[in-house]
């Protein structure tokens, strides 16, 4: 906490996740880099998807990875692949897009980007990441919410109040993928 800034919240996170079906994932985020990189990568048995720099790259494998692993005899052998690049929408409104969709749902009945239950899943995952860090061990979802609250309150109790703080308001236009606030 406060790895890169004088704050008491996480500003540098790396999380490893494992799902019931055996799938794994890595989530990395930081505020300690000069220019962030948004990258989403999904590795599957027969292909890989990468979303980065306003494009989706689909790398299809000529042979499934699971089959290749069993049959390959070359040292450092690699699967033959072919790529398909797909341009994606240049405007990525991120947070402001979610807020605008929420307002549109209230005002005009237009669809949400995701229902509230999906947002709750994100909060649960974030809280699990924090609890794992608080305890210094892996945690499973669902986790003990009372334990999470107890651990969180320990941190609240030792929080350092900053003296002589001045409120600052910033123009955040352009920070959400070019979307206007």
Residue ranges and their predicted role:
Residues 99, 123-126:
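Short, hydrophobic/amphipathic alpha-helical packing segments
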Residues 5-6, 14, 19, 44-117, ...:
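C-terminal glycine/acidic-rich active-site capping loop/insertion
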Residues 36, 113, 123:
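Loop/helix-junction capping segments adjacent to catalytic residues or to phosphate/diphosphate-binding pockets
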């Amino acid at each position: 906490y406060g790895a890169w800034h004088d704050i008491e919240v996480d500003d540098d996170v790396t999380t490893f996740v494992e799902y019931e079906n055996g799938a794994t994932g890595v989530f990395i985020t930081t505020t300690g880099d000069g220019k962030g990189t948004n990258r989403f990568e999904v590795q599957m048995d027969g292909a890989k998807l990468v979303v980065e720099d306003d494009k989706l790259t689909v790398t299809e494998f000529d042979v499934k990875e699971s089959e290749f692993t069993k049959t390959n005899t070359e040292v450092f052998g690699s699967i033959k692949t072919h790529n398909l690049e797909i341009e994606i929408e240049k405007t990525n409104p991120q947070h402001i897009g979610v807020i605008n969709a929420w307002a549109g749902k209230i005002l005009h009945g237009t669809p949400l980007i995701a229902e509230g239950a999906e947002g709750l899943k994100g909060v649960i995952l974030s809280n699990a990441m924090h609890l794992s860090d608080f305890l210094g061990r892996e945690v499973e979802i669902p986790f003990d919410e009372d334990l999470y609250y107890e651990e969180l309150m320990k941190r609240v109790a030792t929080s350092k109040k900053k003296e002589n703080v001045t409120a600052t308001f910033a123009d955040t236009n352009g920070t959400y993928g070019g979307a206007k606030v």
